[in-house]
Amino acid sequence: MHESQLTTSAAKPSRLGWFDDVLLLGIMAVLAGCGLIYEYLLSHYAGRILGALEAAIYTMIGLMIVSMGLGAFAARKIKDAFTGFVVLELTVALCGSLAILITAAVIGFGQQLPMLIASTLGLPPDQLPEGGMIGTLQKLSEYLPYFWGVLLGLMIGMEIPLIARVRQSLSDEHLLHNAGTIYGADYIGAGIGAAIWVGFMLAIDIQLAAALTASFNLLAGFVFIWRFWQKIQRPKLLLAAHLVVTGVLLLLAIQGPSWEQQFNNLLYKDKVVYAKATRFQQLTFTERLRGNGLSPVYALYINGRLQFSSSDEHIYHAFLVHPTLAASARHNKVLIIGGGDGLGLKQVLRWEPEQVTLLDLDAALVQLFKSPDPDMPERLSQALLSLNGNAFNDPRVTVIHDDAFNGVDKLIAKGDKYDAIIVDLPDPSHPDLNKLYSDYFYRKLKELISNDGALTVQSTSPYHAQKAFISVAKTLALAGFDVKQYHHNVPSFGEWGWSIATLDGKDAQHRLAQLTKLPIADDWLTLGLVKGAFEFPANFYQDATNIKPNELGSLQLYHYHQQAWSETQGLDLF
């Protein structure tokens, strides 16, 4: 009887223990979150480099998903699932932590190469070698994030098949729903990873985020070595390799952000003196020193795109603000949407309004121009406060931090009315920005503007993005406004344009034409410049009938803008 019981017990297949099962599924969930964060990290960085964030995101995610599928097939070639998984996570950790830094170094060197060659050969600054092989190398370097995306995608795609094989090998009986169980953990982990990205990692340095993410891949390798030591080939060697990479990750977490910033600084013409990652965007300030007692030139870049230069920002903001207020019957109550640097606000305050409301999403950006970061160089902080005339500390100013699309609804609900509205938003280079140029948004603003007031929208370049420029006017008209457009040269941007809209009475151009002088004196702007700004080439609007307004959900303006950007920059993602 006793012998029979032993025989029965020996014949019974061993089952996967609950501890190992929970451990493996937990590892799978964590790695899924890491994989999604790598997608976001690389696509976000690629968008900053290429200047086409939305296209970069879709391209990166598409490439990584396809690569993950190929990686799942390639996992068949790995004979030892235990050892293969440990080596895989070690490699993912190393590549994931170094991808951003190496990309920044290569692109930075590519941008500096023409200047290095010119300096070596004694060429003048206006004859930098930028064509031929140098131009090709620079272009190829911009696609390096996609190389990392494909490589990491291949390796991430191997994780699920290997975990599935490990689970099965730990049980003598066939595991029902093995794939479904693992995919369930994978999906949940990916969702958690997305939440971590949005809630935490967007606000920290991108290189630090990469190092932190890679540390979880490395931790998965450590756990496997500890738990399955007897099943792994050369565990001591792999443990030593993990310890070495741990040191690399610590170094990258501490020094990586400053190294990455130094490489990124090579992308700018002038010296980078301050950089900050807010929850919504990357802010970079540059400084160009000038001799002969002239003050330095400061510039702000958001996600790599120039927002203003202190050498000519007054031209842009004078044309944005003064025609608007001059065309308004009153200017006691003014609304500014965007304009978180306070430069337009400074010009508005010159009209002695009773109240100004500024609606901007990024509180961290506004804070830098109100009470600069202690880590910011003193000369820069003083320059910023001087540029905007310390406008944010004026008691007449109310700042609301909210998404403009929803924020204006709250103003409408309160029954607010404004004598003038100035919309100073970034170009519609992203679908989220596109809706702020839609007919629906302009109809909201129609509820806020006084019948005899004026509304002005910065409308991108009429030269580089003609269709987008005209589409803004047609969208305002669709919303019920009487629209005129004007333009002027801003040296840092080239030819730039604005759309000015009214509701009742004469249009803004006629109102301004009746003036004999500007109500306020300006060092740059004259009434003659304002009136002349409404003149366009004879054939400028000849194809306007074929240009569509930007209805909500159509993304029409976004596509016009992206097309113009691609043609101007020679950008082709495929």
Curated annotation (Swiss-Prot):
E.C. designation(s): 2.5.1.16
Name this polypeptide is given: Polyamine aminopropyltransferase
Domain PABS: 257-505
Similarity remark: Belongs to the spermidine/spermine synthase family.
Catalytic center residues: 424
Gene name tied to this protein: speE
Main location: membrane
Alphabetical list of Gene3D superfamilies matching this protein: Vaccinia Virus protein VP39
Entry's localization field: Cell membrane
One annotated GO biological process: spermidine biosynthetic process
Domain of life from the UniProt record: Bacteria
Protein task: Catalyzes the irreversible transfer of a propylamine group from the amino donor S-adenosylmethioninamine (decarboxy-AdoMet) to putrescine (1,4-diaminobutane) to yield spermidine.
Keyword Protein biosynthesis among UniProt keywords: no
Residue positions binding S-methyl-5'-thioadenosine: 281, 360, 403-404
Annotated residues for binding of spermidine: 317, 341
Keyword DNA-binding among record annotations: no
Organism of provenance: Shewanella oneidensis (strain ATCC 700550 / JCM 31522 / CIP 106686 / LMG 19005 / NCIMB 14063 / MR-1)
Oligomer status and interactors: Homodimer or homotetramer.
GO CC terms, sorted: plasma membrane
Topology term for the membrane: Multi-pass membrane protein
Annotated region (Spermidine synthase), positions in chain: 254-510
Segments traversing the membrane: 22-42, 55-75, 90-110, 144-164, 188-208, 209-229, 237-257
Alphabetical list of InterPro entries matching this protein: PABS (IPR030374), SAM-dependent_MTases_sf (IPR029063), Spermi_synthase (IPR001045)
